[in-house]
């Protein structure tokens, strides 16, 4: 995934994870929590680091639903890669990512963290400049370059079960 110095790919990764698991209308939330009601929560985040990124997908569900949840996640990730993504889905994700960046800059700590990182790595840019990359991401580009990297065969799975679980 995206390295910190590749803001275009960072924004694309943020768009992809938002499309999949941010808000009630995102694909995974809609299917697993709203339609099937087999998860309590589902979240997908990208953590950007200097040499690359880590995408974490977390689903909280009853233990007896784990296999079904895993199967539906796999199905939805594959579907996102090959089925048409509607323009309104992409626009919604672009709005959420853009608003998230804008609102994060309201906190002085966030501004200091961004400015400090930029200064440390010698990559100064305007705080809102990552927004310019959002519009360069099309459905086709997401499906060709990022969504293949979010497939189950590219991932590791960790199950955290209660101690008294069998």
Language model: regions and residue ranges:
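Short beta-strand-to-loop capping motifs
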Residues: 1-2, 59-61, 161
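His/Glu-based metal-binding/catalytic segments typifying zinc-dependent metallopeptidases
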Residues: 1-25, 118
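Glycine-rich, charged/polar anion/phosphate-binding loops
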Residues: 2, 40-46, 141-144
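Short, conserved charged micro-motifs
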Residues: 7-9, 64-69, 166
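Buried hydrophobic packing residues in well-ordered domains
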Residues: 14-16, 32, 57, 73, ...
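M16/insulysin-pitrilysin zinc metalloprotease superfamily fold
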Residues: 22-24, 35, 39, 43, ...
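C-terminal regions of mature proteins
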Residues: 93-166
